């Protein structure tokens, strides 16, 4: 009986430790995503955080202009953006800034010429 209890406890601990990975997040990582980082790079500014747990409430630790800081998180839709194999010859033009700018299941994805709304990649 003791052996079975220890095996059950071990299995529960193993499964519990994998839950953040199952949901695509590291332990301590808050849900949601980071807003786009379009700012100029300010190399002399030190990081204000290293991980989400250092940020208050619903803020996430995100890169902003080449350093990390606590910013309001944005909602992220399911699926990943498709790969873009093109090279842009015109100036960048952003048609969206975050997933909630896009209708239905479409995601705001980086493309060769900026961000635009696209259907998530399959697979």
UniProtKB/Swiss-Prot annotation:
Database matches in SUPFAM superfamilies: Elafin-like (SSF57256)
Q: Which residues constitute the signal peptide according to the record?
A: 1-24
Q: Which InterPro entries match?
A: Elafin-like_sf, WAP_dom, WAP_four-disulfide_core
Disulfide pairs? Answer: 34-62, 41-66, 49-61, 55-70, 81-109, 88-113, 96-108, 102-117
Domain WAP spans what residues? 27-74, 75-121
GO BP terms in the entry: antibacterial humoral response; innate immune response
Q: Which UniProt keywords apply?
A: Disulfide bond, Protease inhibitor, Repeat, Secreted, Serine protease inhibitor, Signal
Enumerate the SMART domains for this protein: WAP
Function per UniProt: Putative acid-stable proteinase inhibitor.
Listed name of the protein: WAP four-disulfide core domain protein 5
Natural source organism: Gorilla gorilla gorilla
